[in-house]
Amino acid sequence: MCDMLDNKLGNRLRVDFSNISKQIEIPNLLQLQKKSFDYFLNLDNGESGIEKVFKSIFPIHDPQNRLSLEYVSSEIGKPKYTIRECMERGLTYSVNLKMKIRLTLHEKDEKTGEKVGVKDIKEQEIYIREIPLMTDRVSFIINGVERVVVNQLHRSPGVIFKEEESSTVANKLVYTAQIIPDRGSWLYFEYDAKDVLYVRINKRRKVPVTMLFRALGYKKQDIIKLFYPIQTIHVKKDKFLTEFNPNDFMDRIEYDIKDEKGKIVHQAGKRLTKKKAEQLIKDGLKWIEYPVEILLNRYLANPIIDKESGEVLFDSLTLLDESKLAKIKEQKSFDIANDLANGVDAAIINSFAQDGETLKLLKQSENIDDENDLAAIRIYKVMRPGEPVVKDAAKAFVNDLFFNPERYDLTKVGRMKMNHKLGLEVPEYVTVLTNEDIIKTAKYLIKVKNGKGHIDDRDHLGNRRIRSIGELLANELHLGLAKMQKAIRDKFTSLNADLDKVMPYDLINPKMITTTIIEFFTGGQLSQFMDQTNPLSEVTHKRRLSALGEGGLVKERAGFEVRDVHATHYGRICPVETPEGQNIGLINTLSTYAKVNELGFVEAPYRKVVNGKVTNEVVYLTATQEEGLFIAPASTKVDAKGNIVEEFVEARQDGETILARREEVQLIDLCSGMVVGVAASLIPFLEHDDANRALMGSNMQRQAVPLLTASAPIVGTGMEQIIARDAWEAVKAKRGGVVEKVDNKSIFILGEDDKGPFIDHYTMEKNLRTNQNTNYIQHPIVKKGDIVKAGQIIADGPSMDQGELAIGKNALIAFMPWNGYNYEDAIVVSERIIREDTFTSVHIYEKEIEARELKDGIEEITKDIPNVKEEDVAHLDESGIAKIGTHIKPGMILVGKVSPKGEVKPTPEERLLRAIFGEKAGHVVNKSLYATASLEGVVVDVKIFTKKGYEKDDRAIKSYDKEKMALEKEHHDRLLMMDREEMLRVCALLSKASLNSDQKIGDKNYKKGQTADISELEKINRFTLTTLIKAYSKEIQKEYDDLKNHFQNEKKKLKAEHDEKLEILEKDDILPSGVIKLVKVYIATKRKLKVGDKMAGRHGNKGIVSTIVPEVDMPYLPNGKSVDIALNPLGVPSRMNIGQILESHLGLVGLRLGDQIQEIFDRKQKDFLKELRAKILEICSIPRLANEKEFIKSLSDEELLNYARDWSKGVKFSTPVFEGVNIEEFSKLFKMAKIDMDGKTELYDGRTGEKIAERVHVGCMYMLKLHHLVDEKVHARSTGPYSLVTQQPVGGKALFGGQRFGEMEVWALEAYGAAHTLREMLTIKSDDVEGRFSAYKALTKGENVPATGIPETFFVLTNELKSLALDVEIFDKDEDNE
């Protein structure tokens, strides 16, 4: 399909090679974070996350029942500063949270201590300051720095069953169950080598599971009945009889079934059918004989008590033998735990055997008989060893562990998972454990061990969920409130007298909440410095999923399984995009179409299939909902009516690929590209690349630096405009309308809605610094008179071209060696690329300096600096700050600053100087801000902040006046446009109505009943208009008044907006304590492509520029055009990224077809528009879904010319991932573009002019310049700073350090016998302090370097030994000989 890319989003046509027409639009890429934070702040009027957290902590009661604190309501304030102000002034973009708290004073019954009534109620509003607010671009401004909170992928609360190999016994599997809460104690169930079932709480010492059941209040008999079927045995005439139950004989029968009289009614070894069993019951079979040999290994379910004496003969769980059976015969009946008859596990019986001994010992030490109390005490001792305990405290402790909502929270998700897994029907709102949960978990684990249950996969996306910003913030708020709750309870206990005077504010300290939240944003692992290199890096950063962070995994201990791609990732998590290195697989990205539901589970979209027919109904399913369903891939052949063509389809079911009948298929993938994430879906022909290289390609696109002029790729995938649509860099129209005025800095759009006309104003941001020091600049892409729709991109941001992402440049490349310069992935570049600034980028650096108030006086920003030459400060203005436009070189002063020197008695020379030059010269010292060693560029902006109460300097006043003038001009322009529009509408209204009296309008006279010409009406002014309107009917006068009132209201709104902006401008600067002035200087640096810069394609094909060759020396084509870049052909086969070859083929086709369109322009014949239309139609008819002819025919001549001009530089293609151009389409394109079918061409050597022996693959590839720039990495040191302790040179470019001469380098010098060089390296070039000083002296005087001394390292060692109380003496060699 020839996709116009929805003309509202960009002005570009692309030939689209999709196989499948898109059913739904790609959802907003940032909706997960937006929705999550909106829920937290309650922006859609439901119960907010904040409300829920407050309600979970409040009310707080006084232990003595005197007071209670209740939460009433909360209200969110408005931000005090704008986003731009916060970034410039280093503030946090935040709001105040106002919460209403009610303090109730109770009347107490003196005898019972119970509450009997309310004495007093007080309500108070308490402010919680600085709750960071999400910006409209889904980031946070913390202390002036833009940050992103990454989504966390963590283990879902609920129950999970696992099977692992035993660490102690070979070839034995160990089964475990875990109940995982969101907050509270984890509960582990596990078998040991002897098949005893144990339980652990929070990985403490294990106790038999029956101990926990007893602590929960269950008696021994209750536990037996819960886990084992009980069989009653009747004793009759020395025979053991039991009731006949056919269900006991479902499998083959081990013994003969005999009736009461001993007659065999069914023989052993034969199967008892249902029919036969019914017949036996009909025949009156009620009792059957229970064989003694079977009875011998059974356990008693209930104790057997002697009827006469009342003493217990045998306790429950006694193992029966012949002697015991003989004694039991005297009883009429007894119960046995029919444990092993149905293959039921003996684990619980074994656990009873284990806990019996422990309870006996506890009985003696604690003097308590109740086994339930003893079990609670045992659990308390395991959890808190060494602490004294009483039974009530132990019971309360066990209850608090799992049943107290303050301490334990499963969450709605955990409850849903528990109910689903264990078949429970506990209501959703019960988020603590129940006894039934614990019993059912133990039962299910026994089933799992016996091969009947289902083992869980912890990496299944049904067992992992996403915590987004809203939930993470709610958790932090809960932590802060929990600390505050503890503090309030402590205050309650210390309150004795004057309870009537206590106010909520006396009890609540809101700082505890603020500090917890700010700590999370500044130091949390999930709050990260936003990657702003280009729009793609920003969007993918906000879509990132991290398994690390608080409550997540630790990267050092994360195994291979958790990092691996899981079958459930399909359509939910991108299998390609993840970092290389130790975080591989732990940090992922959401797939393009994936959504996250309310419970935090990732959903993938599918279309429903009914009886082999694909419907248009799209459903989003989680990994759990998808289980067991047959899902066909998007590439399944479907006819025009949507019926699946082939009878058997390759489908997926639970991660396995199987062959299914078309009638069995229930779902089909929405599209082929749903598997991968945003970055991977930007790689054309991704299906032809090896996954490892695609991973590098995805990651390197995020590192592409925005270039001076952006150009969209010739070979795109259609995702470019989606990223531009959702990235905040582009300016999008809030409301539709007509472009009234456009210049480099602003766009004015005049529109009309239900209320009437309006003017929207958009300001273009210029030369702003991003987090990665790249240049943020916007430029309009609309013209005056253009009609725009709401949401349309009206201005491109950095790395954007006509509303599409453009992170690199289209370059003509040849795969050929060039004199060894492209050995090992190196890149040979033509000088033309540098001359035309193709890969030039602008970077902005911020340098700041502050003037402080010191005890000796105040520091001053000034041009008057002591001991500095006049020419060194010539570029500074009168205020001592570099002028805008100044070319900065390393070592130049950016801002002059002098600091007062402490008073010292002056020397005679100083006294003389003071007498000559005045008082000041001696008192101050130069503390100016200098340009660092690698900083070179132009000053583009200066920001000056002055503390309230201190005088602003001239530069700050001029800067303020300039900004004020810009605001005034913008306001004036908007008012003018409003006035013009008002007059136009009034004239249009009056020109349609007839006059009620004779009037002279302009130069013409009109009689009553005539209508005035609009041209004459436009000549009159406003004052004449007020009298003229009276000559019209009352209806017209009313319409005129309505129109006038509407425009007056709009002007009032504009005035209010303008006043608000002025107020912001005039606000006092907030600076840290002690700082009186802060100056920020912004320097823009132009970085041209250099040898050493890193470049890459989109397929993981990266390399370093090795040489820049004059254009005339580069290989050239038969038409004389030289190639831009020469790449090594050996970089392709072993890397298996063939996508780059296909991309360069299609890119060349685009260039050649573009040349053909340019030829039509150049010929400019009479019917050239007709020819253009025919050519574009011919190109667009090649893709499979060629249904664009109507669209191209419907284009006006002007629209067609716009698209054709764009295509003349290269026809743009869109080849979505997994739906790329096929062989037939390629051959058609090659013929149309007049390219040889092998895609190769003859090339000539630029230096000799000779034809190159072999035909060479030449194509057009989209190349990126990455932010690993040589200018920022190259570094050299002669002398510089030394480390204080070791006296060795410091390391790193930032500290102006030296190169490390390590162990292996020492070996190299040793191997060559370079003894003197080695000695120099280890002494005077390193840490021989005296040696380096004397060497420097000798070198300056031209003498020989003297002998080296003792390195400082030796003294450090001796001092270390001295600190261990070892005396170290150093003897000279000569002294020793004596």
From Swiss-Prot:
Coiled-coil portions? none
Q: Identify which top EC class this enzyme belongs to.
A: transferase
What catalytic activity does the UniProt entry give for this protein?
A: RNA(n) + a ribonucleoside 5'-triphosphate = RNA(n+1) + diphosphate
Q: Pfam family example for this protein?
A: RNA_pol_Rpb2_7
Q: Name one GO cellular component term.
A: DNA-directed RNA polymerase complex
- Which Gene3D superfamilies is this protein grouped with? 2.40.50.100, 2.40.50.150, 3.90.1100.10, DNA-directed RNA polymerase, beta subunit, external 1 domain (2.30.150.10), DNA-directed RNA polymerase, subunit 2, domain 6 (2.40.270.10), RNA polymerase alpha subunit dimerisation domain (3.90.1800.10), RNA polymerase Rpb2, domain 2 (3.90.1110.10)
- The domain of life is Bacteria
Indicate the quaternary assembly: The RNAP catalytic core consists of 2 alpha, 1 beta, 1 beta' and 1 omega subunit. When a sigma factor is associated with the core the holoenzyme is formed, which can initiate transcription.
Entry's family note: Belongs to the RNA polymerase beta chain family.
Q: What is this protein called?
A: DNA-directed RNA polymerase subunit beta
Lineage, opening ranks: Bacteria, Pseudomonadati, Campylobacterota, Epsilonproteobacteria, Campylobacterales
